[in-house]
């Protein structure tokens, strides 16, 4: 079963903790609005594998675009990171995880 997110804020915190623990550097793009509890909203991007410019293949996996699907999408990203497979990528491959393309929609 896919472990869905309970809400945007806990999903984002878990995403950031998990991908950083797995060795990724995260780039965050802040949204100008705030979430329902006044929390910061951001689209967070984590990259694994080959650095920019060195990858022959890049796989982009988004948790979702509109918002509501972000709950299940984060669950899939979580399963992938926890599987350990991102640590065994070929040298020419990169995987980019995008958490919450639309953090406003995800949060509300």
Regions found by a protein language model. Name each.
Residues 1-108:
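Structured catalytic-domain cores with a bias toward divalent-metal coordination
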């Amino acid at each position: 079963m896919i472990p869905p997110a309970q809400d945007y804020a806990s999903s984002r915190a878990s995403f950031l903790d998990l991908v950083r623990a797995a060795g990724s550097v995260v780039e965050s793009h802040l949204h100008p609005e705030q979430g329902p509890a006044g929390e910061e909203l951001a689209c967070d991007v984590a990259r694994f594998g080959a650095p920019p410019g060195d990858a022959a293949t890049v796989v982009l996996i988004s948790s979702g675009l509109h918002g509501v699907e972000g709950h299940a999408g984060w669950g899939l990203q979580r399963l992938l990171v926890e599987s350990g497979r991102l640590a065994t990528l070929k040298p020419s491959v990169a995987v980019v995880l995008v958490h919450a393309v639309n953090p406003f929609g995800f949060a509300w």
